[in-house]
Amino acid sequence: MTENSTSAPAAKPKRAKASKKSTDHPKYSDMIVAAIQAEKNRAGSSRQSIQKYIKSHYKVGENADSQIKLSIKRLVTTGVLKQTKGVGASGSFRLAKGDEPKRSVAFKKTKKEVKKVATPKKAAKPKKAASKAPSKKPKATPVKKAKKKPAATPKKAKKPKVVKVKPVKASKPKKAKTVKPKAKSSAKRASKKK
């Protein structure tokens, strides 16, 4: 009985520690933006100066340096930060626009709006289906071309007319028939002479 009572309170502090870790500091992206705003350098602030500012103003863990590198890269790719010098996470960075504090609030609003926008995307799918329907009309145009092709077939019909000219050559056998009677007549003449 006593063992169960001692084990139960031990589990509660672990949950409390987990909640404290989430409340110790804001997001790294927000801290980086705050650090750059605090320095106010036109040339931009370096990653080392950003790390110093974050470590001095916020309670950050041991892996803060790697987290800062990753978040700086993300902010550069999203367009929140502009890299003035260097490549990757090294170099100096400055805010893309001066309205960054409003932007950080806008990011939270956009997250909520993204859920709302998800439903219009479903409504956009029927629009895609409607766009498929007009695509059937261009398919009807090749049918018109097919109608033109039968018009080309009468031209082919003219060629058989040329074939009809060939029976005229068949009249030559008729001449051959006329030759045969001559042979008979010569045979008759020969018989008369006898």
Swiss-Prot record:
Modification sites for N-acetylmethionine: M1
Which residues are recorded as modified (ADP-ribosylserine)?
S104
The known PTMs are summarized as: ADP-ribosylated on Ser-104 in response to DNA damage.
Q: Which GO terms describe its biological process?
A: heterochromatin formation; nucleosome assembly
Q: What does this protein do?
A: Histones H1 are necessary for the condensation of nucleosome chains into higher-order structures. The histones H1.0 are found in cells that are in terminal stages of differentiation or that have low rates of cell division.
Instruction: Tell me the residues on which Citrulline occurs.
Output: R42
What one GO molecular function would you report for this record?
minor groove of adenine-thymine-rich DNA binding
Q: Which residues carry this modification: N-acetylthreonine?
A: T2
The lineage, from the top, is: Eukaryota, Metazoa, Chordata, Craniata, Vertebrata
Where does the record place Low complexity bias? 1-11
UniProt keywords (A-Z) are: Acetylation, ADP-ribosylation, Chromosome, Citrullination, DNA-binding, Nucleus
A Pfam family of the record is Linker_histone
- This chain belongs to the protein called Histone H1.0
Residue span(s) of domain H15: 24-97
User: Where does it localize?
Assistant: Nucleus; Chromosome
Q: Where is this region: Disordered?
A: 1-28, 86-194
- Which gene name does the record give? H1-0
UniProt family annotation: Belongs to the histone H1/H5 family.
A GO CC annotation recorded here is: nuclear body
